[in-house]
Every structure is written in structure tokens, then in C-alpha cells.
């Protein structure tokens, strides 16, 4: 993956100019950005940001923007569990795509506060995995993948209200949805256009 420099923004304060990297500046406004594939390093950063924002104000919403193709199930579940653990309501907003584990995090937002932009793409499916080694090791890993599959399906059922039968059928292969379909499915609550939640400005659009 090519290196992408992190932009900086400069603000005027009563003490003069102050520069922030864009991630830190967004964090000041309780915005967390998940914009990559999910692995342990990414999950640790997201978890740390959620815990920090809870310590800052346990009653104020956190806004998690998601543009992710998915990734590690265990890393994603670390983020999921932290979202459920913190006292702050976590609003989720899909920009671009929320696929695989990214879709699970999208639907795990606070009820009534799960959003997608109009051109977003959402995809759910069963976990992927490749195994090599002795037959016993392969059997162990296969059982674990099936356990993860059942776990993720349970979470989708819990947060969407769909039946387990439908979720098992839909996740058997890649199941793509646009924003309207994701709303009908129960993955999101609202399609955002124009923006009327969260932002850096002093006033929000109505």
C-alpha cells in the first residue's frame, strides 16, 4: 500500500497558531474514522479512541465514520465489544463502503443513530479463512471458522431484527446492498443527504 501522508490543519487560538494532524483534529469533535482494512493495529487505535472519548464525556455521542472493506474478525469484534462497552452512544456513518466486518460495525451503532451516505455500499457474508497443516489442525480451524460464522450471524440478527434463517441464507455468499436496501434490511436507520449530524463546524445543517 502506498504511503499516504497525514494532512495537518492549523487553528488560531488565544495563544497563537496550533497545528493538528487531521485524525487528532477530528477526535476533538468526537469523530473517529475507520478508513482502512481492519487488523489488530487498527483495532487497537479505534478502541483507544473510544475509551478516551468516554473518559472525556461519558454522556456525549461518539461518531464513528466507516469506509472499510472489512478484515480480521477478532480485531473487528474487539471494536464491536468496545462500542457496546462504553457508556457513550456510538453513532455509525458509512461513507463509501462497509463490507464484511465493516458492515457488522456499522449495524452495531446506537439504535436510531446508524447512517449511510446515499452512494454507500454495504456487504455482508460469512467469514473467510485458509488453513494448512495436519488434518487435526485443519479440523480445529474449521470448527473455529464455523463458530465465528454463527457469532457474526447472531450479531446481525440482534441488531437488524432479521430472522436467523434469512441471515444465514444471505451471508452464505457476498450479499451487496445500497443505502436504501441496507435501511430496509435494518443495518442502518437513515440515509444522510444532506448532512445533518456531526461535523467540524460550529453549526450543523438542517
From Swiss-Prot:
EC number: 3.4.21.92
Keyword line: Cytoplasm, Hydrolase, Protease, Serine protease
Oligomer status and interactors: Fourteen ClpP subunits assemble into 2 heptameric rings which stack back to back to give a disk-like structure with a central cavity, resembling the structure of eukaryotic proteasomes.
Function text: Cleaves peptides in various proteins in a process that requires ATP hydrolysis. Has a chymotrypsin-like activity. Plays a major role in the degradation of misfolded proteins.
Sample GO molecular function, one term: ATP-dependent peptidase activity
Cellular component terms (Gene Ontology): cytoplasm; endopeptidase Clp complex
Principal EC category: hydrolase
Swiss-Prot/TrEMBL catalytic activity: Hydrolysis of proteins to small peptides in the presence of ATP and magnesium. alpha-casein is the usual test substrate. In the absence of ATP, only oligopeptides shorter than five residues are hydrolyzed (such as succinyl-Leu-Tyr-|-NHMec, and Leu-Tyr-Leu-|-Tyr-Trp, in which cleavage of the -Tyr-|-Leu- and -Tyr-|-Trp bonds also occurs)
Family, as annotated: Belongs to the peptidase S14 family.
Residues the record marks as active site: 100 (nucleophile), 125
Cited CDD domains: S14_ClpP_2
Domain of life: Bacteria
Gene: clpP2
UniProt key word Protease: yes
Species the sequence originates in: Myxococcus xanthus
Biological process (GO), any one: protein quality control for misfolded or incompletely synthesized proteins
Name of the protein in its database record: ATP-dependent Clp protease proteolytic subunit 2
InterPro entries (UniProt xref): ClpP, ClpP/crotonase-like_dom_sf, ClpP/TepA, ClpP_His_AS, ClpP_Ser_AS
Subcellular compartments: Cytoplasm
Main localization, broad class: cytoplasm
SUPFAM superfamilies reported for this sequence: ClpP/crotonase (SSF52096)
Pfam families xrefs: CLP_protease
